[in-house]
Regions:
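Ferredoxin-like alpha/beta domains used as RNA- or RNAP-binding modules
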Residues: 1-203, 209, 232, 246, ...
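Basic (Lys/Arg-enriched) interaction patch that binds polyanionic ligands
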Residues: 199-250
Length: 275
């Protein structure tokens, strides 16, 4: 990817601060995490949450801090680079194991047939009436075409093995794996992109990522089709920060990996990739 001319002086880095709970569901989650922590540390027993998104993990950390918990917890998603993860609260003398299993799904497609995509697997799993928090990541390794690995809470994993027979129009076989049996997945190769924008406003950055006009980007934002870090973003003028993850319904997800500084024409340089 093309390197752009940059200013000599690096720009001071701004960081997005923690955003407190904004909905009843988020406030309930924080109270639930505090209750788990109280039970775990008052009784010296391990306690585990359901799968949490990145945003929910931030809320969980805040809830633990509010409960005075500084250690004795971790987040586990079943594999190294997991996005969706379970909060494991494990006091020093407790015994426990994260209730995570993995189901390997293998397609029984004819040669040359189109293989299911991530959305096909997720749609089939939702068709089993599973709650999203019972499911972790769905990994489609590039070196294993036609194979997907679904991380799930143990009861959900058992249900998947009993009830899931196809994804989209493709028949599947299922196999329950322990986490020790899950192979190491190759690091996904991300195609990095670089662009310059007039400002670090959401509409300007989104327009660069989507190769559209700022007006079109603003329409997507105002239509409620854009999220930043799993939170709705409805203001085109909102400031963006390094590390932000943008979800645009119908367009994909993007990670703003770096804000290296200014170009010679005094425009902000952004670096990003699409998932």
């Amino acid at each position: 990817w093309r390197t752009m001319a940059r200013s000599i002086d690096p720009q001071p880095k701004a960081a997005r601060g923690f955003i407190p709970a904004r909905t009843d569901e988020e406030r309930y989650l924080m109270r639930h995490i505090e209750d788990l922590a109280h039970t775990a540390f008052s009784r010296d027993i391990a306690r585990y949450s359901a799968f949490l998104s990145d945003r929910e993990q931030d809320l969980a950390r805040a809830a633990l801090g509010r409960a005075g918990v500084q250690e004795g917890f971790r987040f586990e998603g079943g594999w190294l680079n997991a996005e969706r993860r379970v909060l494991c609260i494990e006091p020093e003398y407790s015994c426990g194991e994260a209730p995570i299993c993995c189901v390997r799904l293998q397609c029984r497609a004819q040669a040359g047939a189109a293989l299911p995509a991530h959305k096909d697997y997720l749609g089939s799993l939702m068709g089993l009436e599973l709650r999203r928090e019972a499911l972790g990541d769905i990994v489609l390794p590039e070196d294993q075409p036609g194979t997907a690995y679904v991380f799930a809470l143990e009861p959900a994993a058992q249900l998947i093995c009993r009830e899931l027979f196809q994804a989209g129009h493709t028949e599947l076989t299922t196999e329950l794996l322990t986490l020790d049996e899950v192979p190491q997945f190759p690091q996904a190769e991300r195609e990095m992109h670089s662009a310059t924008v007039s400002s670090l406003r959401l509409d300007a950055v989104l327009a660069a990522m989507l190769h559209c006009s700022r007006g079109q980007a603003s329409e997507l934002i105002e239509a409620g089709r854009v999220e930043i870090n799993h939170l709705p973003a409805d203001k085109p003028h909102a400031q963006v920060y390094e590390g932000d993850v943008f979800t645009v319904r119908g367009k994909g997800r993007f990670n703003l990996t770096a804000l290296p500084g200014k170009s010679r024409k005094d425009r902000s340089i952004i670096e990003f990739f699409q998932y």
